[in-house]
């Protein structure tokens, strides 16, 4: 279907409706004027998912395992986001680039014209049978420790709010917004993980309107760290490294 795209100037309306607003009668998609190019692409792809893949998405969210309207709404958003990531960063080509670049998130973001956060989220979904990538878990938190996004390709689970160790490197990222930080961490069950974290800012734009800051992080079991540029120079074999 033909959809017209417009950069919206109705900021107050968009603040209520989110980063995009679709008018099905006029077939017009309005995007927040302060979105970066990569963010605009992602929002367009997510809306395309809701239009072109509406039937399969509806089938999936009708699963009885989703017990409430809220759960079904979140699943619908998650499926649209997965569609958008797959459209912008096709599985085979993106996995090949990730392996060739040692999963360097910043290089992957520049090569594909998307954000650091989009790359992190896509990396956490590369688990196709037969051709899997590194099994990452992805998380986005605010300064208070509230988790606003999470995705896991493993059995690692997060609490939704609070209770996170203050020594977790993810929180240090807020004090070093332009740096990618790494950390080896050992869990109470003895399992060890490599964490990669960076502070990202969502700009609302203009004087007196500071952007919202989040810390975005990827983690993986330490046995996969040798495949990543972030594992270079770390004492991965030392029992006390974490």
Model-found features: residue ranges?
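Conserved binding/catalytic microenvironments
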Residues: 2-242
């Amino acid at each position: 279907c033909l959809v017209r795209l417009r950069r919206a100037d109705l900021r107050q309306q968009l603040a209520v409706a989110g980063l995009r607003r679709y008018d099905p009668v006029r077939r017009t998609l309005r995007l927040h004027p302060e979105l970066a190019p990569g963010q605009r692409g992602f929002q367009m792809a997510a809306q395309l998912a809701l239009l072109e893949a509406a039937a399969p998405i509806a089938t999936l969210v009708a699963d009885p395992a989703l017990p409430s309207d809220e759960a079904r709404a979140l699943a619908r958003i998650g499926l649209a986001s997965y569609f958008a990531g797959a459209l912008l960063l096709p599985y085979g080509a993106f996995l090949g680039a990730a392996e060739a670049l040692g999963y360097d998130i910043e290089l992957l973001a520049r090569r594909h014209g998307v954000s650091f956060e989009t790359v992190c989220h896509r990396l956490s979904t590369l688990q196709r049978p037969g051709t899997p990538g590194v099994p990452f878990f992805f998380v986005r938190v605010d300064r208070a420790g509230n988790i606003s996004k999470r995705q896991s390709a493993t059995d690692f689970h997060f609490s939704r709010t609070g209770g996170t160790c203050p020594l977790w490197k993810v929180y240090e990222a807020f004090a070093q917004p332009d740096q990618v930080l790494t950390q080896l961490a050992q869990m109470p069950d003895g399992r060890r993980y490599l964490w990669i974290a960076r502070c990202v800012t969502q700009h609302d734009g203009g004087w007196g309107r500071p952007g919202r800051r989040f810390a975005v992080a990827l983690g993986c079991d330490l046995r996969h760290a040798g495949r990543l540029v972030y594992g270079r120079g770390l004492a991965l074999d030392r029992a006390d490294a974490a």
